Amino acid sequence: MRRYLRVVVLCVACGFCSLLYAFSQLAVSLEEGTGGGGGKPQAAVASWLAGGGRGAVRGAGVAGPAAHPGVSDRCKDFSLCYWNPYWMLPSDVCGMNCFWEAAFRYSLKIQPVEKMHLAVVACGERLEETMTMLKSAIIFSIKPLQFHIFAEDQLHHSFKGRLDNWSFLQTFNYTLYPITFPSENAAEWKKLFKPCASQRLFLPLILKEVDSLLYVDTDILFLRPVDDIWSLLKKFNSTQIAAMAPEHEEPRIGWYNRFARHPYYGKTGVNSGVMLMNMTRMRRKYFKNDMTTVRLQWGDILMPLLKKYKLNITWGDQDLLNIVFFHNPESLFVFPCQWNYRPDHCIYGSNCQEAEEGGIFILHGNRGVYHDDKQPAFRAVYEALRNCSFEDDNIRSLLKPLELELQKTVHTYCGKIYKIFIKQLAKSVRDRYARSPKEK
């Protein structure tokens, strides 16, 4: 009996010693695996990467299974795995560089939402017109907007008050800038064509941190999301730096091809009321010109152009842009007339085929047509958007009253095709309410 008791005691003692030895080995391995204690999974991964991905987790300078006798052949010198502790490690997986699954592996990489940069220049009595344009941009756009508003000092307070009242929308930010021209020739630039109009020429030099920008005149109305014209930037080839629409579709009524006394782009010139720019490329490019054999950068070419052509230009900064792209046609992307639809496209009969087929995307009420009775179809759209508020019910009810007003204009050439004025607008309203609340 005593013999059996001794055997039992001896077995228990051996088992206890074996257990102690196992725990001590486990503690040592854990200390080595965390680089001496206190390590995190991120630190382990960093250590592994710092060691060139070669077994650095187990200790600095250790390279692969050769340094670990007894390690299975499946432990390659580049082995790395992640192990969920609720499951046993698979038999064919090397455990040398194996980490527990951790939350950091599943952390979401949230990409910052791209902002669309929109610039406008407002002087004189252009406050209300500009605010209506900005409202049309906000109502239908999807991505956030960043407004760059260049205005005379006396308009800043009014702009700030009106825009701050819209801050509840949280879909846009804005920055107000003074009107600034190069000091040496400020007076000459300011009186070119219309007050402050030539400010747009200097946007690439002023907004140095902005990569791309959509410039629009104050008399622009967006009938579909700004996102859509912004997406045209992706269609630029490697040489294109800006995009505009033709000045005319029909050469028989074109201005540049009949009256211009300076070079102009293409057959009928381009209109700069809607101008999409990759300003990074504009700042880098060296432009061909007819003043010197040396190519000039944007900031160096503007004043020489004005000095050479100031007696021959009629439309100011737009004429200078036409001259630039006459000499550098490969740098311009031309988009269809429906992106810059003006009275000239319908007052002599419809001559914008793209608008007839797909509707008007951007309405450009130049010639002051929003404020007189010469083109009542244009004025009807302007008044509808000016009086529209941001409440959902008001936007939903925008179309029917507008269509009734447009039907009263059928005695004019533009009114006869009034349906193209609401075709895209109706789609934009439908799309707005089809989007989820987070997208609005």
Curated annotation (Swiss-Prot):
Keywords: Glycoprotein, Glycosyltransferase, Membrane, Signal-anchor, Transferase, Transmembrane, Transmembrane helix
GO cellular component labels: membrane
Cytoplasmic side: 1-6
Top-level enzyme category: transferase
Protein's cellular compartments: Membrane
UniProt entry tagged with the keyword Transferase: yes
Listed GO biological process terms: O-glycan processing
Keyword Transcription regulation (UniProt): no
Protein name, per record: Glucoside xylosyltransferase 1
Glycan-linked positions: 173, 237, 278
InterPro entries: Glyco_trans_8, Glycosyltransferase_8, Nucleotide-diphossugar_trans
GO molecular function, one term: UDP-xylosyltransferase activity
Family: Belongs to the glycosyltransferase 8 family.
Topological type in the membrane: Single-pass type II membrane protein
CDD domains assigned to the protein according to its UniProt record, in alphabetical order: GT8_like_2 (cd06430)
Residue numbers on the Lumenal membrane side: 30-440
Membrane spanning residue stretches: 7-29
